[in-house]
């Protein structure tokens, strides 16, 4: 008897709002309890997809293409930096310098590069 009164109470509340009666405790995308009065009915929430306006789609595509162009570099970084700085050209490390032959020329010489003083031995 209490269950029927509860259903009648929810039905009268739903009638005031203009909605269909829904059992207490049921949300969207749920089924009614088995054996209940609404067992055969399913209450699913449906969603409708609407495409954006043509002009909005065009603007979004333009922005996307601009971002793609910004991400792609026209020339690879190795080619761009090749003419600016080269280890072989700027740091003669490892090879013997012509004109400076010492008696230990066959032994490897330790050379260090310092940004404050250039090459050091």
UniProtKB/Swiss-Prot annotation:
The keyword Cytoplasm applies. Disruption phenotype: Mice exhibited no impaired function of motile cilia or non-motile cilia. The lineage of its organism: Eukaryota, Metazoa, Chordata, Craniata, Vertebrata. Residues 1-41, 94-121 are annotated as: Disordered. It comes from Mus musculus. Predominantly expressed in tissues containing motile cilia. Also expressed in non-motile ciliated adult olfactory bulbs. Induction: Expression is activated by FOXJ1 and NOTO. InterPro entries: C11orf97-like. Residues 98-108 have a biased composition (Polar residues). Keywords: Cell projection, Cytoplasm, Cytoskeleton. This is Uncharacterized protein C11orf97 homolog. GO terms for cellular component: ciliary basal body; ciliary base; cytoplasm. It is found in: Cytoplasm, Cytoskeleton, Cilium basal body.
């Amino acid at each position: 008897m209490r269950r029927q009164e509860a259903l009648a109470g929810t039905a009268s509340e739903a009638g005031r709002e203009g909605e269909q009666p829904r059992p207490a405790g049921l949300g969207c995308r749920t089924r009614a309890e088995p054996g209940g009065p609404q067992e055969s009915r399913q209450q699913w929430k449906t969603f409708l997809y609407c495409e954006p306006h043509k002009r909005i789609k065009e603007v979004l595509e333009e922005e996307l293409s601009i971002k793609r162009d910004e991400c792609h570099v026209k020339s690879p970084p190795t080619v761009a930096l090749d003419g600016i700085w080269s280890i072989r050209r700027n740091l003669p490390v490892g090879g013997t310098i012509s004109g400076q032959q010492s008696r230990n020329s066959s032994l490897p010489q330790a050379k260090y590069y310092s940004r404050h003083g250039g090459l050091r031995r």
